[in-house]
Regions:
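Short, well-ordered beta-strand elements
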Residues: 42-56, 77-82, 106
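Helix-loop-helix "hinge/cap" segment bordering the ligand-binding cleft or interdomain interface
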Residues: 72, 128-135, 159-267
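Short, polar/charged alpha-helical segment
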Residues: 55-78, 180
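Extracytoplasmic/secreted envelope proteins and their assembly/folding machinery
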Residues: 60-67, 91, 95, 111, ...
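Short, low-complexity disordered leader/linker segments with a strong preference
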Residues: 1-47, 72
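Solvent-exposed loop/turn segments at secondary-structure junctions
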Residues: 54-56, 86-89, 112-115, 175-178, ...
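Extracytoplasmic "Venus flytrap"/periplasmic binding protein-like
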Residues: 69-152, 188-190
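Short, P/G- and charge-enriched loop/turn segments at secondary-structure junctions
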Residues: 35, 146-147, 157-158, 164-167
Length: 267
Protein backbone atom coordinates (compact mmCIF):
# COMPACT_ATOMS: atom_id res chain seq x y z
CA UNK A 1 0.00 0.00 0.00
CA UNK A 2 1.20 3.50 -0.72
CA UNK A 3 -0.15 6.06 1.75
CA UNK A 4 -3.69 6.06 0.46
CA UNK A 5 -5.76 3.98 -1.93
CA UNK A 6 -5.06 4.46 -5.60
CA UNK A 7 -7.91 5.63 -7.73
CA UNK A 8 -8.55 5.90 -11.42
CA UNK A 9 -9.33 9.52 -12.13
CA UNK A 10 -11.49 8.93 -15.18
CA UNK A 11 -13.71 5.88 -15.36
CA UNK A 12 -12.67 3.36 -18.01
CA UNK A 13 -16.15 1.92 -18.38
CA UNK A 14 -17.29 5.40 -19.25
CA UNK A 15 -14.78 5.91 -22.03
CA UNK A 16 -17.78 5.95 -24.32
CA UNK A 17 -17.73 9.67 -23.60
CA UNK A 18 -14.18 9.92 -24.79
CA UNK A 19 -14.36 13.32 -26.45
CA UNK A 20 -15.69 14.90 -23.30
CA UNK A 21 -12.97 13.36 -21.18
CA UNK A 22 -10.43 14.84 -23.53
CA UNK A 23 -12.03 18.25 -23.27
CA UNK A 24 -12.12 18.12 -19.52
CA UNK A 25 -8.40 17.62 -19.03
CA UNK A 26 -5.89 20.32 -19.77
CA UNK A 27 -4.92 23.89 -19.11
CA UNK A 28 -6.82 26.95 -17.99
CA UNK A 29 -10.05 28.08 -19.57
CA UNK A 30 -11.54 24.71 -20.50
CA UNK A 31 -15.28 24.54 -20.80
CA UNK A 32 -17.32 22.87 -18.11
CA UNK A 33 -18.15 19.19 -18.46
CA UNK A 34 -21.47 18.50 -20.19
CA UNK A 35 -23.22 15.16 -20.17
CA UNK A 36 -23.93 13.91 -23.73
CA UNK A 37 -27.14 12.16 -24.65
CA UNK A 38 -25.57 9.43 -26.74
CA UNK A 39 -22.23 7.84 -27.52
CA UNK A 40 -21.14 8.86 -31.01
CA UNK A 41 -19.94 5.65 -32.66
CA UNK A 42 -19.22 7.44 -35.95
CA UNK A 43 -16.20 9.22 -34.48
CA UNK A 44 -12.79 7.83 -33.57
CA UNK A 45 -11.17 8.68 -30.25
CA UNK A 46 -7.77 8.23 -28.65
CA UNK A 47 -7.47 8.24 -24.87
CA UNK A 48 -4.17 8.49 -23.03
CA UNK A 49 -3.92 6.39 -19.88
CA UNK A 50 -1.10 6.86 -17.37
CA UNK A 51 -0.57 3.92 -15.03
CA UNK A 52 2.02 2.37 -12.73
CA UNK A 53 3.32 -1.18 -12.85
CA UNK A 54 6.66 -1.53 -10.98
CA UNK A 55 8.26 -3.03 -14.16
CA UNK A 56 6.17 -6.14 -13.44
CA UNK A 57 5.59 -8.00 -16.71
CA UNK A 58 2.50 -9.77 -15.41
CA UNK A 59 0.91 -6.49 -14.40
CA UNK A 60 1.95 -4.94 -17.71
CA UNK A 61 0.21 -7.75 -19.60
CA UNK A 62 -2.93 -7.23 -17.51
CA UNK A 63 -3.05 -3.61 -18.65
CA UNK A 64 -2.33 -4.56 -22.26
CA UNK A 65 -4.90 -7.37 -22.33
CA UNK A 66 -7.56 -5.17 -20.71
CA UNK A 67 -6.93 -2.49 -23.32
CA UNK A 68 -7.02 -5.06 -26.14
CA UNK A 69 -10.35 -6.43 -24.88
CA UNK A 70 -11.76 -2.93 -24.44
CA UNK A 71 -10.74 -1.83 -27.93
CA UNK A 72 -12.33 -4.97 -29.38
CA UNK A 73 -15.61 -3.97 -27.77
CA UNK A 74 -15.22 -0.31 -28.73
CA UNK A 75 -13.33 -0.30 -32.07
CA UNK A 76 -13.60 3.48 -32.45
CA UNK A 77 -11.69 4.07 -29.18
CA UNK A 78 -7.94 3.60 -28.92
CA UNK A 79 -6.12 3.60 -25.58
CA UNK A 80 -2.58 4.95 -25.51
CA UNK A 81 -0.87 3.47 -22.44
CA UNK A 82 2.05 5.11 -20.68
CA UNK A 83 3.58 3.20 -17.78
CA UNK A 84 5.40 4.71 -14.81
CA UNK A 85 7.39 3.09 -12.02
CA UNK A 86 6.53 5.76 -9.46
CA UNK A 87 3.21 7.36 -8.46
CA UNK A 88 4.97 10.61 -7.68
CA UNK A 89 6.15 10.88 -11.27
CA UNK A 90 2.59 10.51 -12.55
CA UNK A 91 1.53 13.27 -10.18
CA UNK A 92 4.37 15.57 -11.19
CA UNK A 93 3.78 15.01 -14.90
CA UNK A 94 0.06 15.71 -14.57
CA UNK A 95 0.81 18.95 -12.71
CA UNK A 96 3.36 19.96 -15.33
CA UNK A 97 1.03 19.16 -18.22
CA UNK A 98 -1.92 21.07 -16.77
CA UNK A 99 -0.17 24.26 -17.82
CA UNK A 100 0.39 23.01 -21.37
CA UNK A 101 -2.96 21.34 -21.89
CA UNK A 102 -1.39 17.92 -22.39
CA UNK A 103 -2.67 16.01 -19.38
CA UNK A 104 -3.82 12.40 -19.82
CA UNK A 105 -7.48 11.52 -20.21
CA UNK A 106 -7.15 8.81 -17.58
CA UNK A 107 -4.62 8.29 -14.82
CA UNK A 108 -4.10 6.37 -11.63
CA UNK A 109 -3.97 8.70 -8.69
CA UNK A 110 -4.32 9.28 -4.96
CA UNK A 111 -7.16 11.32 -3.45
CA UNK A 112 -4.78 14.05 -2.30
CA UNK A 113 -3.41 14.32 -5.84
CA UNK A 114 -6.91 14.96 -7.17
CA UNK A 115 -7.29 17.84 -4.72
CA UNK A 116 -4.26 19.46 -6.34
CA UNK A 117 -5.46 18.78 -9.87
CA UNK A 118 -8.74 20.51 -9.04
CA UNK A 119 -6.91 23.81 -8.64
CA UNK A 120 -6.91 23.93 -12.45
CA UNK A 121 -10.01 25.19 -14.26
CA UNK A 122 -12.15 22.21 -15.29
CA UNK A 123 -9.04 20.05 -15.26
CA UNK A 124 -10.78 16.96 -13.88
CA UNK A 125 -14.15 15.75 -15.14
CA UNK A 126 -16.84 15.26 -12.46
CA UNK A 127 -18.24 11.76 -12.79
CA UNK A 128 -21.60 12.05 -11.00
CA UNK A 129 -23.76 12.19 -14.13
CA UNK A 130 -21.66 9.51 -15.77
CA UNK A 131 -22.11 7.24 -12.76
CA UNK A 132 -25.87 7.72 -12.94
CA UNK A 133 -26.28 7.22 -16.69
CA UNK A 134 -28.73 4.38 -17.26
CA UNK A 135 -27.09 3.54 -20.57
CA UNK A 136 -23.37 4.10 -20.08
CA UNK A 137 -22.83 4.53 -16.36
CA UNK A 138 -22.15 2.09 -13.55
CA UNK A 139 -24.02 -1.06 -14.52
CA UNK A 140 -25.38 0.73 -17.60
CA UNK A 141 -27.53 -1.16 -20.10
CA UNK A 142 -25.40 -0.11 -23.09
CA UNK A 143 -22.01 -0.93 -21.55
CA UNK A 144 -20.57 -3.69 -23.72
CA UNK A 145 -19.06 -5.73 -20.92
CA UNK A 146 -20.01 -6.85 -17.43
CA UNK A 147 -19.32 -3.59 -15.63
CA UNK A 148 -19.82 -3.07 -11.93
CA UNK A 149 -22.92 -1.39 -10.57
CA UNK A 150 -22.70 1.31 -7.94
CA UNK A 151 -23.94 -1.11 -5.29
CA UNK A 152 -20.98 -3.37 -6.03
CA UNK A 153 -18.45 -0.69 -5.08
CA UNK A 154 -17.61 -0.45 -1.38
CA UNK A 155 -19.09 2.84 -0.21
CA UNK A 156 -16.15 3.79 1.98
CA UNK A 157 -13.80 3.40 -0.96
CA UNK A 158 -16.07 5.43 -3.23
CA UNK A 159 -16.37 8.16 -0.60
CA UNK A 160 -12.63 8.75 -0.92
CA UNK A 161 -13.28 9.84 -4.52
CA UNK A 162 -15.63 12.64 -3.44
CA UNK A 163 -14.45 16.26 -3.32
CA UNK A 164 -16.42 19.48 -2.94
CA UNK A 165 -19.74 17.97 -3.94
CA UNK A 166 -18.62 15.73 -6.82
CA UNK A 167 -17.05 12.37 -7.55
CA UNK A 168 -13.82 12.64 -9.50
CA UNK A 169 -12.49 9.08 -9.43
CA UNK A 170 -13.41 5.44 -8.97
CA UNK A 171 -11.61 2.96 -6.69
CA UNK A 172 -10.88 0.36 -9.36
CA UNK A 173 -7.43 -0.23 -7.87
CA UNK A 174 -6.82 -0.93 -4.21
CA UNK A 175 -3.61 -1.75 -2.40
CA UNK A 176 -3.16 -3.79 0.71
CA UNK A 177 -0.23 -4.73 2.89
CA UNK A 178 0.62 -8.21 4.09
CA UNK A 179 3.41 -9.59 6.22
CA UNK A 180 5.02 -12.82 5.04
CA UNK A 181 6.88 -14.79 7.70
CA UNK A 182 9.36 -17.60 7.19
CA UNK A 183 7.87 -19.79 9.89
CA UNK A 184 10.65 -22.36 9.55
CA UNK A 185 13.37 -19.83 10.32
CA UNK A 186 11.40 -18.19 13.13
CA UNK A 187 10.89 -21.53 14.86
CA UNK A 188 14.51 -22.52 14.22
CA UNK A 189 15.47 -19.41 16.20
CA UNK A 190 13.34 -20.67 19.10
CA UNK A 191 10.30 -18.45 18.58
CA UNK A 192 6.63 -19.13 17.93
CA UNK A 193 4.75 -16.99 15.44
CA UNK A 194 2.18 -15.02 17.49
CA UNK A 195 -1.46 -14.60 16.52
CA UNK A 196 -0.95 -10.84 16.60
CA UNK A 197 2.32 -9.58 15.22
CA UNK A 198 4.04 -6.71 17.03
CA UNK A 199 6.99 -4.52 16.13
CA UNK A 200 8.78 -5.68 19.28
CA UNK A 201 8.54 -9.27 18.05
CA UNK A 202 9.84 -8.28 14.61
CA UNK A 203 12.84 -6.46 16.07
CA UNK A 204 13.66 -9.24 18.53
CA UNK A 205 13.53 -12.03 15.95
CA UNK A 206 15.43 -9.93 13.41
CA UNK A 207 18.20 -9.33 15.92
CA UNK A 208 18.36 -13.03 16.79
CA UNK A 209 18.58 -13.92 13.10
CA UNK A 210 21.83 -11.97 12.77
CA UNK A 211 23.77 -14.53 14.82
CA UNK A 212 26.65 -16.03 12.82
CA UNK A 213 28.73 -19.19 12.78
CA UNK A 214 32.51 -19.11 13.20
CA UNK A 215 32.96 -19.18 9.41
CA UNK A 216 30.91 -16.02 9.05
CA UNK A 217 27.74 -17.59 7.71
CA UNK A 218 24.41 -16.94 9.36
CA UNK A 219 23.32 -19.67 11.74
CA UNK A 220 19.68 -19.69 10.74
CA UNK A 221 20.25 -20.31 7.02
CA UNK A 222 23.93 -21.25 6.70
CA UNK A 223 24.39 -18.65 3.99
CA UNK A 224 26.60 -15.61 3.59
CA UNK A 225 23.62 -13.32 3.06
CA UNK A 226 20.53 -12.85 5.21
CA UNK A 227 18.00 -10.04 5.29
CA UNK A 228 16.05 -10.61 8.51
CA UNK A 229 13.32 -8.07 7.78
CA UNK A 230 12.38 -5.98 4.78
CA UNK A 231 9.56 -3.50 4.22
CA UNK A 232 8.93 -2.86 0.55
CA UNK A 233 8.02 0.79 1.07
CA UNK A 234 9.89 2.67 3.77
CA UNK A 235 7.46 5.56 3.24
CA UNK A 236 4.58 3.28 4.16
CA UNK A 237 6.50 1.88 7.08
CA UNK A 238 6.94 5.32 8.60
CA UNK A 239 3.30 6.26 8.03
CA UNK A 240 2.07 2.98 9.53
CA UNK A 241 4.31 3.34 12.56
CA UNK A 242 3.19 6.94 13.09
CA UNK A 243 -0.44 5.87 12.93
CA UNK A 244 0.03 2.86 15.18
CA UNK A 245 1.96 4.94 17.71
CA UNK A 246 -0.72 7.62 17.77
CA UNK A 247 1.63 10.27 16.36
CA UNK A 248 0.36 13.03 14.08
CA UNK A 249 1.03 12.96 10.34
CA UNK A 250 -1.26 15.56 8.75
CA UNK A 251 -4.74 16.99 9.16
CA UNK A 252 -7.74 17.45 6.86
CA UNK A 253 -6.54 20.92 5.93
CA UNK A 254 -3.36 19.45 4.49
CA UNK A 255 -1.14 20.82 7.24
CA UNK A 256 1.95 18.67 7.80
CA UNK A 257 2.24 17.59 11.43
CA UNK A 258 5.04 15.06 11.17
CA UNK A 259 8.02 17.34 11.77
CA UNK A 260 8.52 16.72 15.47
CA UNK A 261 10.54 14.69 17.97
CA UNK A 262 8.16 11.71 17.72
CA UNK A 263 8.86 11.36 14.01
CA UNK A 264 12.58 11.79 14.58
CA UNK A 265 12.54 8.94 17.09
CA UNK A 266 11.00 6.61 14.49
CA UNK A 267 13.42 7.66 11.79
Amino acid sequence: MKRMPKLISVLLILCVFASLFTACHGSKGLREFEMPDEFDTSRNYELTFWAKNDTNRTQMKIYQNAIKDFEALYPNIKIKLRLYTDYGKIYNDVITNIATGTTPNICITYPDHIATYLTGVNTVAPLDELFASEKYGLGGSEVRFDGVSRDEIIKKHLDECYFDGNYYAVPFMRSTEACYINKTYVEKLGYTVPDELTWDFVWEVSEAAMAKNEDGTFKVNGQNVLIPFIYKSTDNMMIQMLRQSGYAYSNESGEALLFNDDTKSLL
